[in-house]
Amino acid sequence: MVNKSNVLLGVTLLCIALVIVPVNDALAKYLSSDLKILEIIWARFFGHFILLVPLAYYLKGRKGFFNSSTKHQLTRGLFIFLGTAFFYVSITKIPLPNALSLLLIAPIIVVVLSVYILNERITLLKIICALIGFAGTLLVIQPGFADFNSYSVYALVSGLFYAMYLIYTRKVNFSSDSIVSLSYSTIPGAIIMTLLIPFFWESIPSLNQIMIMGCIGPVVIISHFFFIKAYQYAEASVLAPIHYFEIVSNVLISVIFFKDIPTIAVSIGIMCIISSGVLISLNQKNT
């Protein structure tokens, strides 16, 4: 059972991760204007793989790296690969915030599935907070659903795979070390994309593009480390509404780099997002 005193720590760690994640998404979208999306997906997973997997195996040894949760770890890694691939494809044709709003259907799926897969207790407050968070996201994004197309479907599909990744992250964290879990999240994607990329690579990236591609792996490692640690301290259904904080950091990046000042509706949406997370965390701590 998760110690209630650790819930706040789990929420804090997840918020840190969600501040970092949009940076990685922004790098991917920037590169997609000149490079094939498969090259960017390969860089994301191979960079993560080459930096972390050898280190994890060296530190933990064969017994620490291969254990009873290996099957779940690989399944989890496959889900994050599929979710990332569909999301990256979607942002080549639709704005990043719009894609993110569709991806964020995942926390609502987590609240429901955590009851059946993880045997976690769901409450009316958890459901309400998840819905408030989603409503806040729509206020922030104000997506034009009249322009709904196949690339929007890709973003929705990525949300489904991301939800399963969240569930399996919680499932394996009871028996696995953080660095091992972090390593397995890249193995399926790195292997699949390394096998596929020779058939799709067309041109040599510029030095600037290579440097940006090289940053994606480390950024992913840092964000996912905080992400995995968060799920060691709090239930999946408790953390679900907090994932909407990612849109807050997304808006902040837009303000800082693109001088895009939030409207009143966006500000109200941000307050809804933050409120949903605070309410569910305080309720968990006091019950």
Per-segment meaning from a language model:
Residues L31, I40, R44, S90, ...:
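Hydrophobic/aromatic residues within transmembrane alpha-helices
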Residues L9-C15, A56-Y57, R62-F86, S150-S158, ...:
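Loop-to-transmembrane-helix transition segments
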Residues F87, A106-I128, V248-S267:
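C-terminal transmembrane-helix exit sites in multi-pass transporters
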Residues K29, I37-L38, L52, F145-P205:
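Transmembrane alpha-helical segments that form core, pore/gating elements
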Residues L18-A26, V53, G77, F81-A85, ...:
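Hydrophobic/small/kink-forming positions within alpha-helical transmembrane segments
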Residues D34-L82, F161-M164, Y184-F200:
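Transmembrane alpha-helices of multi-pass small-molecule transport proteins
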Residues L125-I141, A265-Q284:
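Hydrophobic transmembrane alpha-helices of multi-pass small-molecule transport proteins
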Residues L100-I105, V172-P188, H224-V255:
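Helix-helix packing/entry segments at the starts of transmembrane helices
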